[in-house]
Amino acid sequence: MKIFFITSNPGKVREVANFLGTFGIEIVQLKHEYPEIQAEKLEDVVDFGISWLKGKVPEPFMIEDSGLFIESLKGFPGVYSSYVYRTIGLEGILKLMEGAEDRRAYFKSVIGFYIDGKAYKFSGVTWGRISNEKRGTHGFGYDPIFIPEGSEKTFAEMTIEEKNALSHRGKALKAFFEWLKVNLKY
């Protein structure tokens, strides 16, 4: 099976292709620009993206949106994670967290899949904490400052396989693949 992944983020493509490729699913990246609305929930961003893209890109296609939600910052950066990363970066988040005792945070991923005129969503959440400093060279985005529960490593200190086993995106991909097995008999 071939799925078109609409994203300009090569890190996401590597993770998705690594996970789904083990099941013989080919991921083809399409860098088709589409508006990302500012909404309160990742699900709304994905719904809008699918609605905008259908009929403009080949099927079946998928999109993914994710966010980092930090408890002591009342869920910030959340749905604005991409914008915040581009503007204040990891250094800005670490500065905002200076002196914070509560470093709990979670990543959430929402995958949207469109096939045969229907849209489906799959999500995954990973709890963890924000480190005191950047660590690691793998991954992308907030990976160097996020330590998932049950680990002492940041996502950026893990191999792609280790990260996919624990990450929000890995959990969403697992739910997606389970759905594919049942509904498309894959």
Curated annotation (Swiss-Prot):
Listed binding positions for Mg(2+) are E36, D65
- One GO CC term on file: cytoplasm
Residues that bind substrate: T7, S8, N9, P10, G11, K12, S66, F140, G141, Y142, D143, K163, H168, R169
Q: Recite the UniProt cofactor note for this protein.
A: Binds 1 divalent metal cation per subunit; can use either Mg(2+) or Mn(2+).
State the superkingdom: Archaea
**What GO terms are given for molecular function?**
dITP diphosphatase activity; ITP diphosphatase activity; metal ion binding; nucleotide binding; ribonucleoside triphosphate phosphatase activity; XTP diphosphatase activity
Which reaction(s) are listed as its catalytic activity?
XTP + H2O = XMP + diphosphate + H(+); dITP + H2O = dIMP + diphosphate + H(+); ITP + H2O = IMP + diphosphate + H(+)
- What biological-process terms (Gene Ontology) are attached? nucleotide metabolic process; purine nucleoside triphosphate catabolic process
Which prosthetic group or cofactor does it need?
Mg(2+); Mn(2+)
Q: Which InterPro entries match?
A: dITP/XTP_pyrophosphatase, ITPase-like_fam, RdgB/HAM1
One Pfam family assigned to this protein is Ham1p_like
Q: Which UniProt keywords apply?
A: Hydrolase, Magnesium, Manganese, Metal-binding, Nucleotide metabolism, Nucleotide-binding
**Which residues catalyse the reaction?**
D65 (proton acceptor)
| Subunit and interaction comment | Homodimer.
| Function comment | Pyrophosphatase that catalyzes the hydrolysis of nucleoside triphosphates to their monophosphate derivatives, with a high preference for the non-canonical purine nucleotides XTP (xanthosine triphosphate), dITP (deoxyinosine triphosphate) and ITP. Seems to function as a house-cleaning enzyme that removes non-canonical purine nucleotides from the nucleotide pool, thus preventing their incorporation into DNA/RNA and avoiding chromosomal lesions.
The family this protein is said to belong to: Belongs to the HAM1 NTPase family.
For this entry, the protein name equals dITP/XTP pyrophosphatase
